[in-house]
Regions:
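Short amphipathic alpha-helical coupling elements at transmembrane boundaries
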Residues: 8-23, 50, 86-94, 110-114, ...
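Hydrophobic, small-residue-rich transmembrane alpha-helices and their short perimembrane loops
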Residues: 84-87, 91-104, 131, 198-214, ...
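Small-residue-enriched core segments of transmembrane alpha-helices in multipass membrane transport
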Residues: 14, 52-69, 88-94, 161-175, ...
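Membrane-water interface of transmembrane alpha-helices in multipass transporters/channels
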Residues: 45-53, 77-89, 154-163, 195-202
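Juxtamembrane helix-boundary/capping and inter-helix hinge elements in multi-pass membrane proteins
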Residues: 2-4, 12, 43, 78-82, ...
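Signature of multi-pass transmembrane helix bundles
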Residues: 1-83
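Helix-loop-helix junctions within the multi-pass membrane cores of secondary transporters/permeases
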Residues: 94-172, 226
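Transmembrane alpha-helical segments and their short flanking loops
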Residues: 142-229
Length: 229
């Protein structure tokens, strides 16, 4: 009885924190609009051009990651990557629209079944991947961290880069699979590398869109690893 009560308590706290996080995320666009307007008025169109460059670099890095998944599937699983992308396309679209690794798990499991992966493997690998396989989040924090460090004139030496990589790995594994989690992890990373907190305003406006892209790539990674296993 005591263990059941404790379990219920922790589950209630988990639901409460998720609702609070979701509520905060809903009000972020308004704060971002005010912050971005002020920033553009102060710095001019150069800021918008820099953000567009950051977005392009991020999407290109995700495309390279997706290509790496396809190569691994072809070399190890001996499956045509086109078949993988074709059968997983609907799950990737669902992941893109949901922007949540946890919410996309049922779609990924169905995709595994279409690819002939046993339920015994997919029921273990997909939930595990939704927790620890955050390649998209790693890329996001790396690109955003370097971009913002450059914008604010923060020098990044070898030791700083090593510390940054280690922090990104830890933060990506510990990040919950919910919308907006990447932004919270990025704020922690920026604090560590010495970038001012106001730097977040540069990426807040497009974070939701970036979250969709990185979740779709995470989804492809989860299924690709399940296929290889």
């Amino acid at each position: 009885d005591y263990s059941k009560g404790l379990k219920t308590l922790f589950e209630s706290f988990n639901i409460l924190f998720l609702k609070i996080t979701t509520l905060i995320v809903k009000f972020i666009p308004l704060a971002v609009l005010c912050s971005m307007t002020s920033l553009v008025m102060l710095t001019g169109t150069e800021t918008l051009l820099a953000i567009m460059s950051f977005f392009g670099t991020f999407v290109l890095a995700l495309a390279v990651m997706l290509l790496a998944y396809c190569v691994l599937v072809f070399m190890i699983a001996r499956l045509n990557p086109i078949i993988l992308l074709k059968k997983h396309a609907s799950a990737m679209m669902a992941s893109f629209s949901l922007a949540s690794s946890n919410a996309a798990m049922p779609f990924n499991i169905k995709s595994c079944h279409r690819l002939g992966i046993s339920s015994r493997i997919s029921s273990f690998s997909i939930p595990l991947g939704a927790t620890v396989n955050m390649d998209g989040s790693c890329i996001y924090m790396a690109v955003a961290g370097l971009f913002l460090a450059k914008v604010f004139g923060v020098d990044m030496g070898g030791s700083e880069l090593f510390s940054m990589v280690f922090s990104i790995i830890v933060l990506s594994i510990g990040a919950p699979g919910i919308p907006g989690a990447g932004l919270v992890c990025l704020s922690v990373l920026l604090t560590q590398i010495g970038v001012p907190a106001e730097a977040l305003s540069l990426v807040m406006g497009i974070d939701s869109l970036l979250g969709m892209f990185r979740t779709a790539v995470n989804s492809a990674g989860d299924v690709a690893v399940s296929l290889i296993v």
